[in-house]
Amino acid sequence: MSLIVIGLNHKTAPVEIREKIAFNSKEAIKEALKELIQREGIGEVVIISTCNRVEIYVYTANVSDLKRENQVEETIKAFLSNFHNIEIGEFENYLYVYKDTEAVEHLFKVASSLDSMIVGEPQITGQVKESYEIALSERTTSLILNYLMNRALFTAKRVRNETRIGENPVSVSYAAVGLIKKVFDELSKKSILLVGAGEMAELALRHLIGSGIKNVYLTNRTFQRAEEIAKEFNGVAVPFGNLKEQLVKTDIVICSTGAPHYVITEQMLKEVMPLRKHKPIFFIDISVPRNVDPACNELDNVYLYNIDDLQDVVDSNILERKKEAEKALSIVQEETEKFFQWLNSLESVPVIVSIRNKAEQVRQEEIEKFKAKYKDLPPELINSIDYLTQSIINKIMHSPTVALKNNCENKEILIFSARRLFGLDSEEE
């Protein structure tokens, strides 16, 4: 058996590759999970897909040698190629593969926001939880990944509570605002249009209002959703069909939609710029896939930054949180060890259950013999004897149970010896 994670993220792959591999909806993830769980060697599977990463976590079924583990890896690569209609050669070199201890430690880092573009941003924990819930709904997890994902979320909670890594919350949206503030001195005099009413757009809006912005416009394909957020933040909702007209009178545009295509095209801006007398317009595209055609950046007075361009802002946050990240890493390592203690204890569970079942069987048989011999005993005394014998069994079984659960170098010999000592092998024969 083996735990494997195969993926790519903002550190290993540019946005052009990530957007080709991303699963852009819950339905896409569900479809992918259904396909993967049918593949040979895959016993359990969870997919995490965000703006900055795509990762597939697998608990392999009946795979105990390196050759077959490699076959599972190739199976996943082939699946990604077929599902996204992209040649393996286009993305293979950007992938990372972690197994067993490294895989568990990596997941715990991801859930705790230690592997994020901005260390400490809280959104990833919720995204990991949602990814797990989708896998649960599709029944592609069982004992191992259920426990692993729950421990990942528990680890993230420990990191959040036991370190200061979450102080002054940051996110990709916050980094976008930081970039805007470097360019414009007085945000209160500028107008901003948010294209998209999802989580990322709302986060950006909160940060902008906190920075003094007042002239906020918001457009979304679902106008009702745009109105709801605009009302909450004293902004103005703009019908999506009026996007081009709104660009004429906007200084800054932040795009964060789930559209699989360009929402703002080069041709659109060629028509818009003369109408705004070629005044500079500033775009930040934090969508994956990208919503603003990269060709727009070639137009005069159009300044376009995508999610990868936020790295400079991100770096300053990483430096500030480095000390807290070191504390968090010690928590991750501690929880990784605990996970494998639990995993290793599973080897002895069948033996422990068999020993306890045998002890209980003997106890019940002896009580029945006792009751048959002393038929006139009051029920209260029988109940006391039943309780007493249960207590004796539990006390006798405590030390063997602890010994079998604990990790040790010769655990296989210990399990073998326990089976022989308690006569389990002879019963099965």
UniProtKB/Swiss-Prot annotation:
<dbReference type="InterPro" id="IPR018214">
    <property type="entry name" value="GluRdtase_CS"/>
</dbReference>
<feature type="site" description="Important for activity">
    <location>
        <position position="106"/>
    </location>
</feature>
<dbReference type="InterPro" id="IPR036291">
    <property type="entry name" value="NAD(P)-bd_dom_sf"/>
</dbReference>
<dbReference type="GO" id="GO:0006782">
    <property type="term" value="P:protoporphyrinogen IX biosynthetic process"/>
</dbReference>
<dbReference type="InterPro" id="IPR036343">
    <property type="entry name" value="GluRdtase_N_sf"/>
</dbReference>
<comment type="pathway">
    <text>Porphyrin-containing compound metabolism; protoporphyrin-IX biosynthesis; 5-aminolevulinate from L-glutamyl-tRNA(Glu): step 1/2.</text>
</comment>
<comment type="similarity">
    <text>Belongs to the glutamyl-tRNA reductase family.</text>
</comment>
<keyword id="KW-0560">Oxidoreductase</keyword>
<dbReference type="InterPro" id="IPR036453">
    <property type="entry name" value="GluRdtase_dimer_dom_sf"/>
</dbReference>
<dbReference type="Pfam" id="PF01488">
    <property type="entry name" value="Shikimate_DH"/>
</dbReference>
<dbReference type="GO" id="GO:0008883">
    <property type="term" value="F:glutamyl-tRNA reductase activity"/>
</dbReference>
<feature type="binding site">
    <location>
        <position position="127"/>
    </location>
    <ligand>
        <name>substrate</name>
    </ligand>
</feature>
<dbReference type="InterPro" id="IPR015896">
    <property type="entry name" value="4pyrrol_synth_GluRdtase_dimer"/>
</dbReference>
<dbReference type="InterPro" id="IPR000343">
    <property type="entry name" value="4pyrrol_synth_GluRdtase"/>
</dbReference>
<dbReference type="Pfam" id="PF05201">
    <property type="entry name" value="GlutR_N"/>
</dbReference>
<feature type="binding site">
    <location>
        <begin position="121"/>
        <end position="123"/>
    </location>
    <ligand>
        <name>substrate</name>
    </ligand>
</feature>
<dbReference type="Pfam" id="PF00745">
    <property type="entry name" value="GlutR_dimer"/>
</dbReference>
<feature type="binding site">
    <location>
        <position position="116"/>
    </location>
    <ligand>
        <name>substrate</name>
    </ligand>
</feature>
<dbReference type="GO" id="GO:0050661">
    <property type="term" value="F:NADP binding"/>
</dbReference>
<comment type="function">
    <text>Catalyzes the NADPH-dependent reduction of glutamyl-tRNA(Glu) to glutamate 1-semialdehyde (GSA).</text>
</comment>
<protein>
    <recommendedName>
        <fullName>Glutamyl-tRNA reductase</fullName>
        <ecNumber>1.2.1.70</ecNumber>
    </recommendedName>
</protein>
<keyword id="KW-0521">NADP</keyword>
<keyword id="KW-0627">Porphyrin biosynthesis</keyword>
<dbReference type="InterPro" id="IPR006151">
    <property type="entry name" value="Shikm_DH/Glu-tRNA_Rdtase"/>
</dbReference>
<feature type="binding site">
    <location>
        <begin position="196"/>
        <end position="201"/>
    </location>
    <ligand>
        <name>NADP(+)</name>
    </ligand>
</feature>
<feature type="binding site">
    <location>
        <begin position="50"/>
        <end position="53"/>
    </location>
    <ligand>
        <name>substrate</name>
    </ligand>
</feature>
<feature type="active site" description="Nucleophile">
    <location>
        <position position="51"/>
    </location>
</feature>
<dbReference type="InterPro" id="IPR015895">
    <property type="entry name" value="4pyrrol_synth_GluRdtase_N"/>
</dbReference>
<comment type="subunit">
    <text>Homodimer.</text>
</comment>
